[in-house]
């Protein structure tokens, strides 16, 4: 009888044990979720993602190692998990393992490189060649201008614009959609429009205009709706030489000038301005998530460099003096990589040190990635630094 009683109660005991284990598991998940929420600022989720993403990356592994022909005129940019390269002989896109995804051979004297979501834009500054190559679709666009290409840009969704001139016109602006189809052209016989940018979906085109007012140099941004024949409006910028324009969103524009950076709404509202004061602008990068990074120097030559990060209202988020020459710097996500002859340092957007390494060999370029890792370029190779 006792054996029968024991056998009858065993299944219920197992059910109770399963319930206890299930309850404990749910409790652990809830407590873990609460911990992640309340301590989300101190837990580095990027580090966790990097751990699993690069778990098998070693010095002998192919992942994170790139090889190419070295040249002083090469230009580099991150594209997806891989690398885009523009050289005097063309453009190449490599995947995360260093394998070629796409390439196009074109001769260039001064190659320039921009990247969008899936495509790399390459053009010969002062030359006549321009192309876009997609890591998924290969060559999308190949164009040859009548005269020198002054500037070109690619949007986050791979739309393209460029500025040139043609017989009878001081400036001609072209816009292409992400499929490489020409969707807009603007011709001006009276104005110089040497700098341009295009918004997502190729909806808006913006160009910096050079002019005079009462004998004084003046610049402005001419805004175009690509569905209309006439310019939408003009945004004055005063006596500022504009180096670059970028759409930060469909209704916000960033203008990088010789002495000032300006954030503008498309209706003309000034969101913020930042003056470099007595410093000289050496370089800039708007690849950070919601912030602009400037590299400034107190002198035209010398090593009194500083790095400044700015929010979209022009206020400083961080400022840091670097007591040696900055060879290169790059921003992506919430990180900034600063390369000097002695080391590589990665900072967050407040310029708090996040990671560093002195194993930079003869590195000349750095590409920051949004997950906190960085690609160091040295000669004809690139290697991944994982904090």
Language-model regions, residue ranges each:
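A short beta-strand motif characteristic of beta-propeller blades
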Residues: 54-68, 97-105, 137-144, 181-187, ...
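Hydrophobic membrane-insertion alpha-helices, especially the h-region
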Residues: 19-37
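Structural motif
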Residues: 37-41, 90-92, 128-132, 168-174, ...
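Hydrophobic beta-strand positions that form the internal "hydrophobic ladder"
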Residues: 83, 120, 159-161, 202-205, ...
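Repeated scaffold domains used in trafficking and secretory/extracellular systems
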Residues: 19, 65-77, 106-118, 146-156, ...
């Amino acid at each position: 009888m006792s054996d029968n009683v024991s056998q009858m109660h065993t299944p219920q005991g197992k059910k109770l044990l399963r319930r206890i284990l299930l309850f404990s598991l749910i409790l652990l998940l809830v407590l873990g979720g609460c911990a992640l929420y309340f301590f989300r600022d101190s837990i580095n989720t990027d580090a966790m993602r990097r751990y699993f993403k690069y778990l098998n990356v070693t010095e002998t592994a192919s992942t994170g190692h790139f090889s190419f022909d070295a040249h002083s005129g090469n230009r580099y940019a991150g594209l997806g998990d891989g690398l885009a390269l523009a050289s005097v002989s063309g453009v190449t896109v490599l995947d995360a393992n260093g394998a070629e995804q796409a390439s196009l051979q074109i001769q260039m004297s001064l190659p320039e490189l921009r990247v969008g979501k899936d495509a790399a834009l390459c053009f010969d500054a002062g030359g006549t060649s321009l192309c876009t190559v997609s890591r998924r679709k290969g060559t999308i666009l190949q164009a040859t201008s009548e005269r020198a290409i002054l500037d070109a840009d690619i949007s986050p969704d791979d739309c393209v614009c460029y500025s040139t001139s043609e017989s009878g016109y001081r400036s001609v602006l072209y816009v292409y959609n992400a499929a490489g189809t020409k969707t807009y052209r603007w011709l001006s016989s009276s104005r110089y429009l040497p700098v341009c940018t295009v918004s997502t979906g190729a909806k808006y085109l913006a160009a910096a205009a050079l002019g005079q007012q009462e004998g004084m140099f003046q610049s402005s941004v001419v805004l175009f709706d690509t569905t209309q024949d006439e310019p939408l409006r003009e945004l004055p910028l005063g006596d500022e030489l504009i180096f670059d324009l970028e759409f930060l969103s469909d209704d916000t524009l960033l203008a990088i000038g010789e002495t000032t950076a300006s954030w503008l709404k498309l209706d003309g509202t000034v969101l913020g301005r930042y003056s470099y004061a007595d410093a000289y602008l050496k370089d800039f990068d708007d690849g950070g998530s919601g912030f602009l990074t400037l590299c400034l120097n107190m002198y035209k030559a010398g090593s009194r460099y500083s790095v400044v990060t700015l929010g979209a209202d022009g206020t400083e988020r961080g400022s840091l003096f670097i007591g040696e020459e900055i060879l290169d710097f790059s921003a992506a996500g919430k990180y900034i990589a600063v390369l000097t002859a002695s080391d590589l340092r990665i900072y967050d957007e407040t310029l708090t040190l996040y990671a560093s390494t002195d194993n930079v060999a003869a590195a000349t370029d750095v590409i920051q990635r949004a997950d906190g890792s960085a690609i160091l370029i040295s000669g004809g190779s690139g290697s991944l630094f994982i904090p």
